[in-house]
Amino acid sequence: MNKTLQFYNYEQCYAHYTKRIMSIRQAKIHDEVIVAKPVLLLALIDGIEGGEFTGNRFVLNEWLEKRYLTLMKQYTRNSQFPNPADISNPFWHLQGDGFWHLIHKTAVAEGSTPTKKWLKENVTYGHFDDDLWVLLQSKVWRQKLRDYIVEHKLTDDGWLGKIAAEGLGAIAAFLLAA
């Protein structure tokens, strides 16, 4: 779908969700940031673009798994880890970032990340906030958001800027303590 609503504030929605995307919590193992959540977002956006997902219901299916693995291989080619994170990790944990939600068939699993098998058996689908879904219906805004994720979450330049900001924050804290 490439519909644009005439009286919808796309700029405001885009600004809100880019801020939320920058706040995505990502694991860091041996100084390497795990990119599974941003990669899952790209796979979902690609599914919308390609017509695989026509409603705000994303089922953990074979197409999504294959697209996710293809993108993981692309964005983790210099990784110290030989195998990319299983799709169950970001599919489950992205719900903690506030704009991705899972609809369960049964009670929610407690404790650690459920397996892919458990997710397929117990989660009906995942979905975005309604406003994000509306934004993603516009081809222009969908591409802008995809480009933003790649630039800020999946490239070295994005991480170098974040590392520099963290370093400046540490220096400022040190100077204030002195």
Which positions does each model-derived feature cover?
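Intrinsically disordered, charged low-complexity linkers and terminal tails
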Residues: 1-178
